[in-house]
């Protein structure tokens, strides 16, 4: 590809963009490389933002060019060019999306911009013709006074075009006569029929800018008149609309509640403080259980040690008896031999029984405490479930 042809096509694109009043910056480097990302913004601006008439045409034909990727955008643009503009590009869709073909892509962009400008001029001409036809139809048909509006019994004049003209502003309307006398006997506060007709034409031109379909025009006028005549009804309609919006919000909230109920079905909701209290109680119970198990393992060892000590205590005095029988007979007068030997093991056995009773009482107290703790935790769980 010659660089001269590429520069010529870029100059042509610059001229078209000037006539189009393109506000954004143009990526000329991307256009020279044949990058599609450089040409797509220009095409989207020409079809969506340049002409409101072309945008309306796209809306009527249900064509959306916003929020689409490059492939879908090019697909819709090719369909639009085929259906609405009767234009077939030189490149195919795949070739246009691929990199390269810089000169051909610039030519296609220029052709699209020219087609859009031609379509814009054509649609403007159609709108002007339709507005002229409306003016003619309005001028041919006199506007009858509605039954609701009372026609004022003031000076009424008829214009050359056949309109009824009423003196709404306390200014007399003078009929234009055929003789050519220059303002003979016309007072200062009067207005000629030509001035009134010019004012009506200006008002019609302003109203033609607000586009209402011809079939819906009488309905819209009737609705506006009803709103002006009955402000209470309009207020009620506004209140109804607000109520409908609130009802929609309520239905949405109900759906959210149903979803929450479905997600929390079979689950127990517990307060954070209660849950922390339960956890602390459970940890206390676990520690007490561990301590009780340790105590139970320690108790049989102590009992075995006590039994061994008791057996030792019982055996020792009997040995003394058998070993010291000679001197015991000599000390019978004092009475210490038999009594002392019998009393020592009894006292040791009594002390051992007292220790066993004390250990049993402590274990029972621990079990009662554990029962109370379990009952309290069960009550807390019941309250939280309720």
UniProtKB/Swiss-Prot annotation:
GO CC terms of this entry: centriole; centrosome; cytoplasm; midbody; spindle pole
Keywords noted in UniProt: Coiled coil, Cytoplasm, Cytoskeleton, Phosphoprotein
Segments of this protein annotated with the region Binds with microtubules and centrioles: 11-194
Pfam families (alphabetical): CEP44 (PF15007)
GO biological process, one term: centriole-centriole cohesion
Functional note: Centriole-enriched microtubule-binding protein involved in centriole biogenesis. In collaboration with CEP295 and POC1B, is required for the centriole-to-centrosome conversion by ensuring the formation of bona fide centriole wall. Functions as a linker component that maintains centrosome cohesion. Associates with CROCC and regulates its stability and localization to the centrosome.
Name this polypeptide is given: Centrosomal protein of 44 kDa
Organism, as annotated: Rattus norvegicus
Lineage of producing organism: Eukaryota, Metazoa, Chordata, Craniata, Vertebrata
Gene transcribed to yield this protein: Cep44
